Amino acid sequence: MTTATMRAASVPSFGARLDVAEQPVPTPGPGQALVRVLTTGVCHTDLHAVEGDWPVKPSPPFIPGHEGVGLVEAVGEGVTNVAVGDLVGNAWLWSACGHCEHCRTGWETLCEQQQNGGYSVDGSFAEYMLVDAEYAAVVPAGSDPVEVAPVLCAGVTVYKGLKVTGVRPGQWVVISGIGGLGHIAVQYAVAMGMRVAAVDIADDKLALAKKHGAEVTVNALDEDPVEAIQRQTGGSHGVLVTAVHPSAFGQAIGMTRRGGTIVFNGLPPGDFPAPIFDIVLKGLTIRGSIVGTRQDMIEALDFYARGLIHPTVAERQLDDVNEVLDEMRAGKIDGRIVLRLATA
């Protein structure tokens, strides 16, 4: 009997070029579904996975990717909530235990037993992937598989981060870093009724933020971003840091008005200086936020389905994956890159 194969891009060792080659198509186990991948976004987390530069590392060889969109082709034993032909996606939160304190209280993204797509389990840089049927994202019918792919990580991540800031309609939020996450964060913030100030070091990215509804834009190379934000907004009610440079994290404290909340989405290496006196005197809250729960995913995709979110994407092919990662290392990507693997 001939084993079915698929093309996949796998990481043979940390820092190596991805190997695009034939591999066996996986078989869905109990509770799992086999998905024929149409598209997959390329996330900065994928680059960290390839480099192996986070404290918790994947185990090579593995297939990256956690923004995959595709059609269910087969289901394993006990699967009832997705069916053959459904349009679904994988996500960073591939599965969780469902029983711990965090899972029981709606914070499954903090589950210590969670599995992560394209990291601890093989992901979507392949023609086929497995999903846990209980945690797979159900993609709204009629979605553009290319455009919707980044919502599965970048979108849900910034959406949850904005929720955590507690910023209300009519209040100011700073989006620090207008890259793959930040340009989508601007759109969610506007759709949620927030007033947006965007901070970056590239004029073209600030122009993109302006296009998506930012009222204030600040180039941190041309002027002091803390002074500029305080002058133009009176201090932001919240700051969402999606940037990948540690300096942005310290600057966020100075941008925030008294009683405000700073949320970190970006994950650069290293530490940042935190002025204890200012944090205490201003009554600031500093929080981390990682991706989103299944309910957050439903809500984030609903914004897309209603036409409120349009990620800026460029379409490439699986064979381009190493070049795409090189462009990501060099900071040359505007918006998000989405790899096309098949058509519906």
What are these regions (language model features)?
Residues 141-223, 227-228:
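Mid-domain Rossmann-like dinucleotide-binding core that forms the NAD(H)/NADP(H) cofactor-binding site
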Residues 45-51:
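Cytochrome P450 core scaffold surrounding the K-helix E-X-X-R motif
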Residues 1-6, 203, 250-254, 294-344:
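C-terminal hydrophobic helical "lid"/dimerization subdomain
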Residues 165-169, 201, 207-285, 342-344:
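Glycine-rich cofactor phosphate-binding loops and adjacent beta1-alpha1 units
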Residues 95-176:
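NAD(P)H dinucleotide-binding glycine-rich loop of Rossmann-like/cofactor-binding domains
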Residues 26-40, 53-101, 140-143:
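Glycine-rich beta-strand-centered segment in the early N-terminal region that forms part
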